A protein has these predicted regions:
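N-terminal secretory signal peptides that target proteins for export/translocation
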Residues: 1-22
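Intrinsic low-complexity/disordered segments
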Residues: 9-13, 39, 44
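Bacterial N-terminal signal peptides
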Residues: 25-36
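Exported/periplasmic ABC-transporter solute-binding proteins
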Residues: 41-86, 90-97, 106-114, 119, ...
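Phosphate-/polyanion-interacting regions in eukaryotic proteins
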Residues: 102
Length: 278
């Protein structure tokens, strides 16, 4: 208002050119003010990288966050580790933009140590356990005990497991712990990039193992259950903000929402277990 008053005091209302200059100045002031206001409320375009285990929960919760905040979410999916181009560490190495990464906790810790994630930005999201599927319509073997799981693996004609943390555990530890590594390895295969349940659903493999949250969404496969707790490998999922994130404030808001008590019903509905401490 002070600027406008000065303009009026210096103007000569009786001169057409003075009035024209006055109007131009007022229009300029208004346009600058409008542009500034628009910039302040402009929604952020958040780039999110998410690995498989938390993806189902993220797909439920992400749109709610976007609707509530006006921000948009540009999402890239990929495993937390491995050699595939889609793996989150490889995406970051190539310089793909990211404001949020959601991945296996220990893989996130590796990125923090490498200086790629902001220290202190890690937030715990959920725990994931390993489960098994068969093709829809097939008999469901008993896997409720250690011995039952052992027999199910021995009698299966073919076994599939993922190329993520759960699959690495199955290949390197579970078979050994059950004492059947030599018998089952020739018929077992790690499945890269695609959901394990999908290759069971189409009949390529008789049984498949992956984190429960990654098994449940796939049509054509029947979820049998979790492997016994004494044999479980619990995978912790966490989120962090990469160094160089364009929207760190909005990224933190998204992460806090995913970890909030309000989000837990959706998190649990996807087969994940809530983390009691954040």
């Amino acid at each position: 208002m002070l600027l406008s008053s000065r303009i009026f005091l210096n103007a000569q209302p009786d001169t057409p050119s003075s009035m024209k200059n006055l109007l131009l100045k007022l229009c300029t002031v208004a346009l600058v003010a409008m542009s500034t206001a628009a910039a302040n409320v402009q929604a952020a375009d958040l780039h999110v990288m998410s690995s498989g285990g938390f993806t189902a929960a993220y797909k439920l919760l992400g749109p709610r966050f976007a609707s509530a905040t006006g921000n948009t979410l540009d999402t890239a999916l990929g495993p937390s580790m491995g050699k595939s181009p889609e793996a989150i560490p490889n995406r970051l190495e190539r310089g793909e933009p990211a404001d949020v990464v959601i991945m296996v906790g220990y893989a996130l810790d590796d990125l923090i140590k490498e200086g790629k994630i902001i220290p202190g930005s890690r937030v715990e999201l959920a725990d994931s356990r390993i489960g098994m599927v068969v093709r829809e319509g097939a008999a469901k073997p008993d896997i409720g005990s250690v011995e039952a799981l052992r027999q199910a693996l021995l009698h299966a004609k073919s076994i599939a497991y993922s190329d993520s943390a759960s699959g690495v555990y199955i290949e390197r530890e579970l078979f050994k712990r059950l004492g059947i590594e030599d018998q089952v390895k020739p018929k077992a295969k790690m499945i890269p990039r695609i959901p394990v349940a999908s290759v069971v659903a189409n009949g390529d493999y008789e049984i498949g193992f992956q984190q429960v949250s990654e098994l449940l969404p796939i049509k054509g496969a029947t979820y049998v259950g979790k492997i016994p707790e004494s044999l479980q490998s619990v995978t912790r999922y966490a989120a962090g903000i990469p160094i160089g994130a364009q929207h760190p404030k909005e990224a933190k808001a998204l992460i806090d929402y995913l970890a909030s008590p309000e989000a837990q019903p959706e998190v649990k509905s996807t087969g994940l277990d809530s983390v009691t401490m954040h």
